[in-house]
Amino acid sequence: MNRCAENQIENVKIITADMNDFEIQEKFDNVISIEMFEHMRNYKELLLKISNFLNEKGSLFIHIFSHEFLAYPFENEGDGDWMAREFFSGGMMPSHNLLLYFQDDLKIDHVWRLSGKHYEKTSLAWLREMDNNKGKIIEIFRETYGENNAKIWFQRWRIFYLSCEQLFGYNKGTEWGVSHYRFVKN
């Protein structure tokens, strides 16, 4: 919002909500979703809901990470599934083309696929920032997760960033990457 204020842009509204329960009567010219769809599974229902938030000529921009070909759920089926349990509970790794099958209420206007090398670099940068600010972050984690869990969560986030760095850099960034979609009203 600071950037918006600096540029005298006043028609931006940031909403952070649980989309399972979210309702709003207000209509928007554009809706932007950043890394939310990975945490959802019923894309048909979600896109219907978002279409109701849009003006007649409105558009939806979606930024998600994706696999080039495979869609798979994040399932918590045991101790080894810590990432599914702690970071993506109930979510799914979508394939790049998965959203193309959900055009009942909104239709695809444009699709982009970005190499995973970008997210690899981003994950490494976040890891460095985290390591450089360990003391501050441990304090935040104490407030968030409790005294006994702060260091555990610090390590979980470190492993998360390392895992993402490796995953998105795998095979020169061609398998896992970032997908962008612009949907418009039907």
What is the meaning of each model-derived region?
Residues 1-4:
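Conserved hydrophobic residues forming the short capping helix/wall of the S-adenosyl-L-methionine
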Residues 63:
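Alpha/beta-hydrolase-fold catalytic nucleophile elbow
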Residues 6-21:
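Conserved SAM-binding strand-loop segment of SAM-dependent methyltransferases
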Residues 66, 70-178, 184-186:
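Substrate-binding/catalytic lobe of Class I Rossmann-like enzymes that use SAM or dcSAM, i.e.
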Residues 20-31:
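A short acidic, Gly/Pro-enriched loop at the edge of an enzyme's catalytic core
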Residues 44-59:
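A short glycine-rich, Lys/Arg-flanked "PGG" loop and its adjoining helix->strand segment in the class I
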Residues 33-36:
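A short beta-strand submotif of the Rossmann-like class I SAM-dependent methyltransferase core
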